[in-house]
Amino acid sequence: MDQDAFILKEDSEVEREAPGGRESLSDVIGFLDAVLSSEPTDIGGDRSWLHNTINTPQGPGSAHRAKSEGEGEVSTPSTQDNRSGEESRVSGRTSKPEAEAHAGNLDKQNIHRAFGGRTGTNSVSQDLGDGGDSGILENPPNERGYPRSGIEDENREMAAHPDKRGEDQAEGLPEEVRGSTSLPDEGEGGASNNGRSMEPGSSHSARVTGVLVIPSPELEEAVLRRNKRRPTNSGSKPLTPATVPGTRSPPLNRYNSTGSPPGKPPSTQDEHINSGDTPAVRVKDRKPPIGTRSVSDCPANGRSIHPGLETDSTKKGHRREHIIYERDGYIVDESWCNPVCSRIRIIPRRELCVCKTCPKVCKLCRDDIQCMRPDPFCREIFRS
């Protein structure tokens, strides 16, 4: 009887409303926003306001109502089409109980999911019951019924005060792993690693680990001065031997023209240029000797050897020049004399005296029978 009376009452209310009104989804969203906007601390209080009718300014289309004697179910009428009033009353009578049960289940699931998503990160359990005053204990037991340990209390304290974690990180303090047991100390010299790794602890403090120190300008200058004092030529060795007391220095090289005293090693130009910061590299001064060089009497490959320097014109006499070549299967060696004051050429030829003091015939060319080529110089020599 009560159910029939309730259906008749709802039908009369639907008839008083405008026919063809549609249920808007914004009413359900508004109801969920009103529930979710409440603080978590107010859930344990009186929640009888959840069973009151929510009046929204949506017009005749909103039909959310709650039964005063029910279990918190929200009744929503079925969606009406633009049909006649008689058809809407018949369809309302037949589908009213099913729509109420289905809408109530959907609202309960939505409310439970909304509260579970918002308070899922906290360790406080939410109780959405029938509407009674179900308070939450300050320190409720865990899932197995045992009282909470000190670690869980510390986790709750850190969740309630998130600024404390930021202060610890700003001060450079190590952040301990929550819910893990710290390893015991390995002795007086070892430090506790607080469960971070299984490596043996070192003697230094874990609070100083990973702290970067910005060097001051004074520290940088001290490092630069220390690096400058280090010798840069530690791996190099001087080319000349150093003077050792009680030992005799080696004789001077005949190519060395520096003229240093015998008790002191020869000095080079590089010693005056090098400073204390650059590595000492000594280069020997190799200057060509002053004077004439001995000229070989035998030319190579049929050509006379050019020593590269002018001969001394003060030395009077002749020099012997040779040319060796092959003729008709025989090796022919021809030789002749030229004045010493003349220039040595690559192409063998007779040269005249430049100083006008060299003899025309010497003991080397006295036995010559023929000349290499019949030039006036040869005729003059053999004629005389």
UniProtKB/Swiss-Prot annotation:
Binding-site positions, Zn(2+) 2: 341, 353, 355, 358
Signal peptide per UniProt: none
Residue positions binding Zn(2+) 1: 318, 337, 362, 365
GO MF: metal ion binding
Biased composition (Polar residues): 50-59, 191-206
Name by which UniProt lists this protein: Protein V
Effect of residue 353 to R: 60% decrease of in vitro zinc-binding
Listed GO biological process terms: negative regulation of NLRP3 inflammasome complex assembly; symbiont-mediated suppression of host cytoplasmic pattern recognition receptor signaling pathway via inhibition of IRF3 activity; symbiont-mediated suppression of host cytoplasmic pattern recognition receptor signaling pathway via inhibition of MDA-5 activity; symbiont-mediated suppression of host cytoplasmic pattern recognition receptor signaling pathway via inhibition of RIG-I activity; symbiont-mediated suppression of host innate immune response
Something else known: The P/V/C gene has two overlapping open reading frames. One encodes the P/V/W proteins and the other the C/Y proteins.
Record organism: Sendai virus (strain Z) (SeV)
Residue ranges the record marks as coiled coil: none
Domain notes: The C-terminal zinc-binding domain is involved in binding to IFIH1/MDA5. This domain is also involved in viral pathogenesis.
Effect upon mutating residue 336 to G: Attenuates viral pathogenicity in mice
Annotated Gene Ontology cellular component terms: host cell cytosol
Quaternary structure and interacting proteins, as annotated: Interacts with host IFIH1/MDA5 and DHX58/LGP2. Interacts with host IRF3. Interacts with host RIGI regulatory protein (via CARDs domain) and host TRIM25 (via SPRY domain); these interactions prevent TRIM25-mediated ubiquitination of RIG-I and disrupts downstream RIG-I signaling.
Keyword Transcription carried by entry: no
Functional summary from the UniProt entry: Plays an essential role in the inhibition of host immune response. Prevents the establishment of cellular antiviral state by blocking interferon-alpha/beta (IFN-alpha/beta) production and signaling pathway. Interacts with host IFIH1/MDA5 and DHX58/LGP2 to inhibit the transduction pathway involved in the activation of IFN-beta promoter, thus protecting the virus against cell antiviral state. Also interacts with and inhibits host IRF3. Blocks the type I interferon signaling pathway by disrupting the RIG-I signaling pathway.
InterPro entries, per the entry: Paramyx_V_Zn-bd
Chain positions found as Phosphoserine: 68, 125, 192, 249, 257, 260
Composition bias type Basic and acidic residues, residue spans: 7-20, 83-101, 150-168
Family statement: Belongs to the paramyxoviruses V protein family.
Domain of life: Viruses
Keyword Metal-binding belongs to the record: yes
Region span, Disordered: 1-23, 38-317
